[in-house]
Structure formats: structure tokens, C-alpha cells
Regions:
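Residue-level recognition of pore/gate-forming positions within transmembrane alpha-helices
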Residues: 21, 53-54, 79-83, 126-130
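Alpha-helical transmembrane segments and their short interhelical loops
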Residues: 10-11, 15-69
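Terminal transmembrane helical anchor/hairpin motif
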Residues: 87-139
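Short cytosolic juxtamembrane segments of multi-pass membrane proteins
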Residues: 140-144
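Transmembrane helix segments
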Residues: 59-108
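Internal alpha-helical transmembrane segments of multi-pass membrane proteins, especially GPCRs
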Residues: 14-19, 48, 73-79, 115, ...
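Short helix-to-coil transition segments within interhelical loops
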Residues: 2-10
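Hydrophobic alpha-helical transmembrane segments of multipass membrane transporters and ion channels
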Residues: 23-31, 80, 120, 124
Length: 144
């Protein structure tokens, strides 16, 4: 509630707390993946993975922002928001069609993209993440 009366306002708060760190993280992850990678991914694939990971980090941050009422709840939700990334291991562990039970998790499609290098797997990641961000942003707005 106090955010609305600060000079930044709600949008300024989100920009300062989400957008700036997200842009910095995208650049750093791209640089690190480019120079420290042992997988031999192309620069284009590395760029895409950096962007998708950044989008997933926004989803995780929005979970905390939308539902945490205080610092203790925020710390607990930080643990829960890590479940956004659990989809990354599913296609590597479960190789038959049962893996698609987890297709509602955006990170599942990032792993599918990494395995197959099929650019169509980027779209479900973007649409699912965008939908989650939209829902969580509306929850955040209703909370304030």
C-alpha cells in the first residue's frame, strides 16, 4: 500500500525492482554462457537461452511479489518459486510421452528446446510465462 504514495509509484517500483536486475541478469548470463560453456552451443542458441531464463526469473520474482505479505513469507515463497525451474530436468529424466504431463511448466519447454534445438519450443515458453506474468501482475495490483 505504501508503494502507491512513493515518488516511484507502482510501475516505477516494478521497473526498479524487476526490469533493471532482469536486464543485467540477461547480459551476465549471456556472457557467462558464451565464455564458460562446455556444451558448444552457438551464440544464437546461447542468446535465446539467456532470454528464456530471464523470462523464467521474472515469473519466479512475480510469484514472490504477488503472494508475499512480509519478509518471512517472501523467503518461503522464494523456495516455492524455484519450482518454476523444475521443468528443466523432466525431459532429461523422463524420455517417453509421459513427460508431457509437465507441459504446463514453462521451463519444460526450455529443456525441450535445448534437447532438440527446435525453435518452435520457444513459443510455449513465451506464452506460458507471459500468461503467468499477466496473472501474477493482476494479483499484485489487486493486493496493493
Amino acid at each position: 500500500r505504501y508503494i502507491t504514495i512513493t515518488p516511484l509509484g507502482k510501475k516505477g517500483y516494478l521497473i526498479s525492482r524487476l526490469l533493471i536486475p532482469v536486464l543485467f541478469a540477461a547480459i551476465v548470463s549471456f556472457v557467462l554462457l558464451s565464455f564458460c560453456s562446455v556444451s558448444g552451443m552457438s551464440l544464437w542458441t546461447t542468446f535465446i537461452i539467456s532470454i528464456l531464463a530471464t523470462i523464467l526469473s521474472v515469473v519466479a520474482a512475480m510469484i514472490i511479489l504477488a503472494y508475499a505479505g512480509n519478509k518471512v513469507e517472501g523467503m518461503a515463497l522464494a523456495k516455492v518459486s524455484a519450482l518454476v525451474m523444475v521443468g528443466l530436468i523432466i525431459p532429461f529424466v523422463i524420455t517417453d510421452s509421459i513427460q508431457y504431463v509437465f507441459s504446463f511448466i514453462p521451463s519444460f519447454w526450455v529443456a525441450k528446446f535445448l534437447i532438440s534445438n527446435n525453435y518452435w519450443f520457444i513459443l510455449p515458453t513465451i506464452f506460458l510465462s507471459g500468461g503467468l506474468i499477466y496473472l501474477l501482475y493482476n494479483r499484485y495490483n489487486a493486493k496493493i
